[in-house]
A protein has these predicted regions:
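Histidine-dependent nucleotide/RNA phosphoesterase domain, centered on the 2H-phosphoesterase fold
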Residues: 2-146
Length: 146
């Protein structure tokens, strides 16, 4: 359910449970190859949860208004590239859903050894094509902690 703008922490295209499970299963298979070629990925946290539409510190009124009018709407997402840095792993996605991120993506994991955070997926520069696959997400509002 949409919230007044001042109460919003972020708005996301939250993956459906089926899509989260599908992405986690796909990622677990990829992780074997990643660990073989990137030796610093031994301890990590898995996410596979959402594509950020906007975080409150950068959210424009236009984006907020769009999200209110599309609240709880489902969107198809196509995963098309895998990105890896020393701090984060993500899939780049195509979707008709709006996002204020330069690159639309879903964070898959962060590296505990390098103190990676989900925001670090915004700074991935190395991407490789993957066999595209479909996911689905729902526009969801997340409230600030008070």
């Amino acid at each position: 359910m949409s919230l007044p703008k001042k109460q919003v922490l972020y708005i996301a295209l939250e993956l459906t449970t089926d899509s989260q499970n599908k992405l986690k299963e796909w990622f677990s298979k990829q992780m074997l190859n990643i660990q073989a070629t990137h030796t610093n990925w031994n301890e990590y946290s898995t996410y596979c949860h959402h594509m950020t539409i906007a975080f409150y510190t950068e959210m424009t009124q236009k984006t907020y208004t769009w999200c209110v009018s599309h609240d709880a709407e489902k969107f198809k997402i196509t995963a098309k590239e895998l990105g890896i840095s020393d701090k984060a792993i993500a899939v780049k996605v195509d979707t008709l859903c709006l996002s204020e991120n330069v690159l639309k993506h879903v964070t898959l994991a962060t590296n505990k050894e390098t103190k990676g955070k989900p925001v670090d997926s915004n700074y991935i520069t190395e991407w490789q094509n993957i066999e595209p696959f479909e996911l689905e997400g729902v526009v969801t509002f997340y409230k600030k902690y008070e």
